[in-house]
Amino acid sequence: MRKRIYHSFKTQQHPLLLRRPLPPKLPKLPLVKKKVRIVQTGSAREPQEARRKFDTEESALVKIDQSVSQPQKPASVQNVCLDYEHDEPERVVNIFPHPHGVRRLHWKVPKSAAGSMFIPRCLSASSRVFRKTLSQIKRARKSLKSKQDEDLTKKPFSNTLVISEELSKPLPPSYSRLIASRFKHSGTKFRPAPKISHYIQELPLLKDVKETVLSPISSASSAIPEPEWSERPLPKTTIGKVIQLNTGSLPPAHSLPTPALPRKPPRQIMIENAVMTRKTETQKPVEITLRPTRRLDPDAHVLRGDGFKAVGATRSETILALTTLAIINCQIYGRNALNFKGFFLAQCPDLTSVAFQLVYLNLSYNDLHQFPGEVLYLQNLQVLKLRNNPIREIPSEIQQLKYLRKFTIAFNFITSLPAGLFCLNYLEELDVSYNEIENIPNEIQKLRSLEKLTVDGTNITAFPPGILKLNLVKLEFENTFTIPPFWLENSCNNPPRLTHICSLFIVKNNLHKILDYDPVVVQKYLISTSDCDWCHGPKFGEGFGIIRSCNIFGLSHVPIKFHVCSLSCYLEIRESSFVLEGFPSRRIALNMDWVKERKVSNVSFYL
């Protein structure tokens, strides 16, 4: 039993054989010649005289065959005019020569049509096969014509081509689709009207709508110029019923977005706004009011005077008045700085009123021939600038400025530095550049707070050995005679005097302590005024000088001139490679450059 059920189920799964449908039977076409009628298009209101004006060149020739069974022959298109107002044809195409027995077919092309157009020779095969179906469609179209006429009054005319009903045969659908596809809506879309309540407009009803011909909007690719609205004929309208249009139900208005303006820099925007405000402002006329003049009686008792007169002051008096005013303002407002730079003062103004409060004083670029004594009374002065003045000497009383930290006296005529200058314990910066200074005293070692020393443009040949005891941060000595070619010349020594040699011999051997009687003349020669830079003993006279260089203060080959007491000290320092300075003693390396090449016999001194 199970085998039978399985066999029956298996037989049901076989695929069914499908038979290919037979083609439909087409009716036999009659072998009868069909005449071609002249089809006229256009508006019904166009006169017949305008149609007769077409020349033979402005027609389309279509030849109809004798029988349907014969092969179709191609049509010959001579010329198609797209614009009646122009005399010259737009294009001429001759594909085949004109055969005999050709009938002319007049086909009117709208002015706005452009591109290729295909004129069918006969009805399509679908119209011959489905003739009954087409007739039913035609009846349905006729019943809908009345509804279409009503829709024309309601819908806006956009890209619409209305053809007259005088055509003998309807155009095939392929041709209508070809013409409709050639037009492109290039205009802007209709903007909806704003929503306004209770607004009614009365318009006349259009009756003969189908008699009017509406030309579609020309495409952007069409080269045919469109006639202006003033040249076009007005449509025929008849005043009939009145239609009331209520715009209360229209959609609300939408505001267009504001265009994005190009960005401008803020400076340009400010300038443009200023220009616009000047243009908008109206210039008000200046009102001139005439005041009545007072007439004086000549017989009246009136006192007349010249009033105040300007007194012509000299340049020096004017400058002195300005400096006095600056000092008064400094005193009133409690200021602690005065700047008289570039006043060309011949003398310093009185500074006693601000002697205790002044900290900064600048007297640069003036005409001070002497060091101003008024500055010495400024007890709390810390910065003093006397640059570019014809000062020739610095008084030793400068040591009264105990708190002076920065002293600048460059571009003057200073020849030497006083001993009182080296008593300023708080001095940090000293600028004596471009002066006539020839040497720097060894007492500079007392300025233990000195950090910056500037001696540019001076006549110095070397630095004293006391500079090795300082803690300088910056040392400047450009445009000087400290270069190595001048070292040998500046190391020449004069022969010592006999009195100096004898005094040195007596002191070193302590003979002045052994002798009970020292004459007064001998005691006068035994007094020493300086010490030896090598043995630190007494030195009589100038001694012997030698220049040795060392690398110090971040500079290389800084020349140091040592003054020794005797020939023995001279030979020792010449052969030594270091020197001890300071307390505790600091070992400073000396460069063995030019002294190794010289011999003792070449030393320029005499015994």
UniProtKB/Swiss-Prot annotation:
SUPFAM superfamilies xrefs: RNI-like
Keyword Lipid metabolism in record: no
Keywords: Leucine-rich repeat, Repeat
Each LRR repeat, start to end: 357-378, 380-401, 403-424, 426-447, 449-470, 471-497, 498-524
Single GO BP term: intracellular signal transduction
Transmembrane regions listed in the UniProt entry: none
The protein, known as: Leucine-rich repeat-containing protein 63
Organism listed in the record: Rattus norvegicus
